[in-house]
Curated annotation (Swiss-Prot):
Protein known as: Aspartate carbamoyltransferase regulatory chain
Organism this protein belongs to: Salmonella typhimurium (strain LT2 / SGSC1412 / ATCC 700720)
Record note on cofactor: Binds 1 zinc ion per subunit.
Residue positions binding Zn(2+): 109, 114, 138, 141
Source taxon at top rank: Bacteria
Listed SUPFAM superfamilies: Aspartate carbamoyltransferase, Regulatory-chain, C-terminal domain, Aspartate carbamoyltransferase, Regulatory-chain, N-terminal domain
Role description: Involved in allosteric regulation of aspartate carbamoyltransferase.
Name of the coding gene: pyrI
Phosphoprotein is among the record's keywords: no
Known partners and oligomeric status: Heterododecamer (2C3:3R2) of six catalytic PyrB chains organized as two trimers (C3), and six regulatory PyrI chains organized as three dimers (R2).
Cofactor(s) needed by this chain: Zn(2+)
Any one biological process term the GO annotation gives: pyrimidine nucleotide biosynthetic process
A single MF term (Gene Ontology): metal ion binding
Length: 153
């Protein structure tokens, strides 16, 4: 019996690979982090087989590199993600997201009365780790929400 271990998503020469994204989360990351606002080629793998996770999503962005802040903001959505820097088809850097103190310009406050909905301000949430949850506190209305509530928003 032979095992066919071919790449299911084409390799990139230079850029960023976000691997080990939980299945069904890849599109949300593309949208929230505005990863599609580029002229560079983006390759997306959805529901790919994974030994560790069963199924996973994968995003490859050519000629684009994420900042440390961007990598860490992934922690809410994909805490087990691996972010690889690729140069000349080789992995030259590898990092994992760690929960940041703040998340800016990504999330929308679930409080419909929050001033952030009516004014041209950038969203900003303080991140607080709780026993079984992560709480996000809006900078403007100062209300605190479970991260699940904010992510579903």
């Amino acid at each position: 019996m032979t095992h066919d271990n071919k790449l299911q998503v084409e390799a990139i020469k230079c850029g960023t690979v976000i691997d080990h994204i939980p299945a069904q989360v890849g599109f949300k990351l593309l949208s929230l982090f505005k990863l599609t606002e580029t002229d560079q080629r983006i390759t997306i793998g959805l529901n790919l087989p994974s030994g560790e996770m069963g199924r996973k999503d994968l995003i490859k962005i050519e000629n684009t590199f994420l900042t440390e802040e961007q990598v860490n903001q992934l922690a809410l959505y994909a805490p087990q993600a691996t972010v690889n820097r690729i140069d000349n088809y080789d992995v030259v850097g590898k990092s994992r997201p760690s929960l940041p103190e703040r998340i800016n310009n990504v999330l929308v406050c679930p409080n419909s009365n929050c001033i952030s909905h009516a004014e041209p301000v950038s969203s900003s949430f303080a991140v607080k780790k709780r026993a079984n949850d992560i709480a996000l506190k809006c900078k403007y209305c100062e209300k605190e929400f479970s991260h699940y509530v904010v992510l579903a928003n």
